[in-house]
Amino acid sequence: MTPDYQLSAIKATETLIKYGIKTAPVDPLPILKQIPGVFVMTFAEASDMAHMDRKDLLSLYGCDNLDAVTNVYLSDDKKHYVVTYNRLLPSRIVDMALARELGHIVLGHDGTRPEDVRQEEARCFAHHLMCPRPLIHSISASNLRVTEDLVRNIAGFPDCCFSCIRKQPGVTVPAELNCIVRDNFMPYIINFFEYQRHAAKYDGSALADLGTYMDNYIE
């Protein structure tokens, strides 16, 4: 069975629109918390609730789920999800893991399809959510040369995540969806580079720190 990469990309784009994402780096945690029937907690919180040592809990989840895992259960014929994540990992690794779990939920994965197919689709969803193509188009529309370093800095991606994005197969997302996301990001991109030019006058850097920028960002 072949993963449906196009559906994953479309669903990620629709998620950005539905939850009004207009700035980067994209944070999947607030999105997860807004979805009815989804409960999010850390591994530490889960171990406290289960009265189980954290290491034993991680062993129970398995070595493939040390960043985040989602458990699904039915109640009143409705799906409910418990997303548990490891907040001790670097923040952007946690964000990618949560974006992947969000993908499983949005794509309606329920275990009826092969594990490798579901994982590929969820990863594709995460990549399109965290580094949406329309965000890159917004940078290009600002008359700046799009480079990997520039995109990585704005999207907040570690190198390993960015390399995974480049390996994703080409997909087609409806133009009207891409236009909405691009237009949503444009004010942020314009503001971002105005701040960079201003900051460079004082510290001589070519690209000021993203965290400092967010502290000064005004909608």
Label every model-predicted segment.
Residues M1-E219:
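Active-site hotspot residues in diverse enzymes, especially metal/ion-binding acidic/histidine motifs
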